[in-house]
Amino acid sequence: MVKHYSNSDVEKWQKEGAVIIKEIFSPKDIKSVHDDIDKVFGYKEGGAPKTKNHGINVTNEKQFLNFENIPLDCSPALNLIGVHPQLIGLAKDALNTKDIRLYQSQAWAKFCGETDFEQSFHCDYGNHTLTVPSKDLTQNSITFLMYFSDVTEEHGPAHYVTRTDSEKIDKISEKFIDNSSDISLQMLLAPYERTTAGVAGTIFAYGIDIFHRATNITKPGAYRYAVTSCFKKARNDTIGYTD
């Protein structure tokens, strides 16, 4: 298989815990998955944006209103995109293994006006392991957040902080464990945040120790279509899907 990602992409993920990759999927792949998500969730439509103007950004259930585990009642395009050969290859290289397992995959549609999608910075390891992330990065996992609609800053892209940037903050992990919603923690991370905005087909690959957050959809009538998939090393029982 000819790789559509580079060694530098793998090295960047291993060092920074996050990398943006484009041109993995063909235009046909992108359109087919978009059309499938449209079939599953497209009876909905975006409205006027909702914005909470005070207090810390809190995750709420409505942010996951259209977040469904795959497989779904649609064509193979959506149901199989999370195990695309390029993703499997990248996951193997990133985790330094020849044997991996998919342990969760979802389709995710967001529509403007359903809620304020803004979140605080957080790490995902609480949903993926009963422990804390391993210092051996290959014993953690890799998550792919893939966009199947064009995502500008008005369409609610995820924002993130690289590992090396977060490590500039003294005792950042302890601060997060002590109080993940502490506004001072959020203020320390904010200067380092980066965007995942990109055209349909953009992939955000990140680790469970990476600080990231959702942002609000502010363009009236807009939507964001995405798919997630998560991989771990085979026989790594410390990683799993905990809802």
Task: Give the positions of each predicted feature.
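Short, structured patches in soluble enzyme cores that scaffold and shape functional sites
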Residues: 106, 123-125, 146-150, 162
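A short secondary-structure junction signal
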Residues: 114-121, 130-133, 154-163, 169-173, ...
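Non-heme Fe(II)/2-oxoglutarate
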Residues: 3, 43, 47-51, 90, ...
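Double-stranded beta-helix
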Residues: 138-141, 151-211, 236
